[in-house]
Amino acid sequence: MTPPCLNCSFFPGQLSPNASTGLLSCNDSEFKEHFDLEDLNLTHEDLRLKYLGPQQVKQFLPICVTYLLIFVVGTLGNGLTCTVILRQKAMHTPTNFYLFSLAVSDLLVLLVGLPLELYEMQHNYPFQLGAGGCYFRILLLETVCLASVLNVTALSVERYVAVVHPLQAKSVMTRTHVRRMLGAIWVFAILFSLPNTSLHGLSPLYVPCRGPVPDSVTCTLVRPQFFYKLVIQTTILLFFCLPMVTISVLYLLIGLRLRRERILLQEEVKGRISAAARQASHRSIQLRDRERRQVTKMLIALVIVFGTCWVPFHADRLMWSMVSHWTDGLRLAFQSVHLASGVFLYLGSAANPVLYNLMSTRFRESFRETLGLGTRCCHRHQPRHDSHSHLRLTTVSTLCDRNSRDVPLAENRDPGCEQETDPPE
């Protein structure tokens, strides 16, 4: 996503974005430090090039190719995820509702944010969508980004409750509860997007002694930078640092709980007299250990993807808000961070379906079925450990829940999957 200053060639501290719209007095003390005698003899095109940079970024072609690849993979993957969850009743589980909301958020980022950013990279100025388009773009992109973070955090909390407090999950983590949570997530994301949106607007380039430059309007920061700095720091704290700490702690507690259960099960097996019972229990423990290893891998993958893809984005915003005097070195560093933030942010939106496909047998088979490719083998003829050994992943652990609409998450456990049958056509 583009930085809060949507034209990354324009940096704060050069000219006042909310100055008077009239001709600027050459004696005005506000502009003495910015005044350049050369500006009096430059054409409007030269002024735009000097202060706003070229209309098209230098790296446009490689960025365009990279973004298009991400767009195709992400749009198809998230679109297929939404289709699978909507069309297959077996996928109507509480956990998958979170995945559906996350996929919708990622789709909006890819369908709205990515094309607009490519357009601005090719045509930085003037901004063509008007004031309404400026506000709508900031609000929409900010909302879907915040909603993505909240969805991942809520999904992690759900997994923690289901694994560590299964009794509470029976009565609390129902589908109705999840629907309400999703509604609250999106409302909350919209409300927290309003402050940043209100700080932006349309502003032309102002040059001392020359006034506003024609065809230089950009959708950028139009309020004092102090307020923007406060909003950005608060947003980073609430929607990155706090979620990352929360998710890491929850996953650590889940891992400790699974390890503790494994030790208890091993001690229980040792205490049994029957060799046959001991052997059967040993096989059961092996299957559960396999599932738990998959759970751990999925949790680690989610944390790494989430953190890696969002660090450049927040570094971009923080740098833009904190730097008051831009040197050539800082400008070059900011442009590099800005390009990286866009690639990683969109890459993160495209990565989730890839994770589902790599780490969930059920999702792979559902994708194949939705695409009309069939499945490699039928569940009811598979060995039991193959049919559900990968189901208790962090984001797809309740996919084995069949034919129930309000079954609590705690009941979507492995033993329940053993009795599963295909839903009626």
UniProtKB/Swiss-Prot annotation:
Residues 81-96, 159-181, 257-294, 353-425 are cytoplasmic. One of its GO terms (cellular component) is membrane. It is a multi-pass membrane protein. It comes from the Eukaryota. Residues 1-59, 118-137, 203-235, 316-331 are extracellular. Highly expressed in the small intestine and lung. Low expression in the central nervous system. GO terms for molecular function: neuromedin U binding; neuromedin U receptor activity; neuropeptide receptor activity. One of its GO terms (biological process) is neuropeptide signaling pathway. Disulfide bonds join C134-C219. Signal peptide: none annotated. Gene3D superfamilies: Rhodopsin 7-helix transmembrane proteins. Receptor for the neuromedin-U and neuromedin-S neuropeptides. This is Neuromedin-U receptor 1. It comes from Rattus norvegicus. The lineage of its organism: Eukaryota, Metazoa, Chordata, Craniata, Vertebrata. The gene is Nmur1.
